[in-house]
Amino acid sequence: MAKKSLIAKNKRPAKFSTQAYTRCERCGRPHSVYRKFKLCRVCFRQLAHRGQIPGVTKASW
């Protein structure tokens, strides 16, 4: 989990557009965040396995 101060800092508008970065909506992780779902890969995988993300199925080929 991210520190509360970092989550609050991320909610404020960035001074410059290049300073803005995405965080996971669920846990606050700053790396490997899928923009479409606003979730990090770890949270995405957990929710997908539980079937809580509509339209997401496990790939098999």
UniProtKB/Swiss-Prot annotation:
Alphabetized PROSITE patterns for the sequence: RIBOSOMAL_S14
Binding site for Zn(2+): C24, C27, C40, C43
GO molecular function: rRNA binding; structural constituent of ribosome; zinc ion binding
Keywords on record: Metal-binding, Ribonucleoprotein, Ribosomal protein, RNA-binding, rRNA-binding, Zinc
Cofactor note: Binds 1 zinc ion per subunit.
Cofactors that this protein relies on: Zn(2+)
GO cellular component: small ribosomal subunit
Biological process per Gene Ontology, one example term: translation
Matching PANTHER family: 30S RIBOSOMAL PROTEIN S14, SMALL RIBOSOMAL SUBUNIT PROTEIN US14B
Entry similarity comment: Belongs to the universal ribosomal protein uS14 family. Zinc-binding uS14 subfamily.
Function: Binds 16S rRNA, required for the assembly of 30S particles and may also be responsible for determining the conformation of the 16S rRNA at the A site.
Subunit relationships: Part of the 30S ribosomal subunit. Contacts proteins S3 and S10.
HAMAP family: Ribosomal_uS14_2_B
Full protein name: Small ribosomal subunit protein uS14
